[in-house]
Design a protein with these regions (language model features):
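N-terminal leader/linker segments that initiate helical-solenoid repeat arrays
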Residues: 1-13
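Acidic (E/D-rich), amphipathic helical modules within compact regulatory domains
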Residues: 26-33, 37
């Protein structure tokens, strides 16, 4: 089974720990899929993991992390997303952060 298939299985079974390991994979496609998976199936540690990824050098990873935080729906993310919105220079990432904040307020 490939890593992308493994991610989907982990999402279905709610295996947050396995997904968290994969957000740091060398393959960017695996990372992006795992980040989305954490947003869909994350529980206890998901918010913290996704917030740290907002500091990643890659804007695509930051954008995916913001989107996943919106999908996760954890209200703890709101303040940190707003902070990152104030310092984010990439317009696509900023748009993802705005969308995530909207989801957290029930608009998504």
């Amino acid at each position: 089974m490939g890593k992308l298939e493994k991610i989907e299985k982990c999402v279905q079974k709610g295996k947050e720990d396995e997904l968290v390991k994969l957000v740091h994979d060398r393959d960017k496609n695996v990372r992006l899929a795992a980040i989305a998976g954490v947003g869909r199936a994350g529980k206890d540690n998901a918010c913290n993991v996704l917030i740290t990824l907002l500091l990643d050098d890659d804007p695509e990873i930051r954008s995916a992390s913001a989107s996943a935080l919106g999908d996760l729906g954890d209200p703890r993310a709101h303040t940190l997303l707003m902070h990152h919105l104030g310092v984010e220079k990439d317009e696509r990432v900023a748009a993802s952060i705005k969308d995530a904040v909207g989801k957290l307020h029930g608009g998504g």
